[in-house]
Amino acid sequence: MHEISLSDVSSLVGQELGTSKWITIDQAMINLFADATHDHQFIHVDPNRAAAESPFGGAIAHGFLTLALLSVMNFSGMPKFREQTMGINYGFDRVRFISPVRTGSRVHGRFVLSDCRLRRASILMTAYNVTVEIENENKPALTANWIAIAQFNPKDRPKAG
């Protein structure tokens, strides 16, 4: 995975910066997420009932599980800022769950840098248009605008331009 200098990041606005590795969402992962979030709706944890009573043909992943996987997708698919000391989630805008992710499906994330702004001497706020794609499906699982903070040592900060 290559690195990006913070002084170069503004020139990359509008460009795709990375695509993550594929992740298989199996029933065990869905069940663990259900346990962690106390969301045991049958469409997620009961494949037989979901096949019989839902329009999905079987169990599907929680939308929030798919959203939560963006962290690992970011680590596997995005270049790092060379001078960054840590990254922090700031939030999401326009999260949309487009298509269900069926048990056994593989997903990956695509990241397009949509904005970057120097906030303080050691803070760069970035925004990414993210898309989680489902293997062999035409429509994505979700789209969102992910806002993150890159913190770095003030002596290494990019010059405002």
Curated annotation (Swiss-Prot):
Main function: Involved in the production of the root hair deformation (HAD) factor specifically on medicago.
Annotated source species: Rhizobium meliloti (strain 1021)
MaoC-like domain boundaries: 10-130
Keywords tagged on the record: Nodulation, Plasmid
Family to which this protein belongs: To the R.leguminosarum biovar viciae counterpart.
Pfam families: MaoC_dehydratas
CDD domains named in the record: NodN (cd03450)
Recorded name of the encoding gene: nodN
Keyword Oxidoreductase: no
Gene3D superfamilies registered for this protein in UniProt: Hotdog Thioesterase (3.10.129.10)
Name of this chain's protein: Nodulation protein N
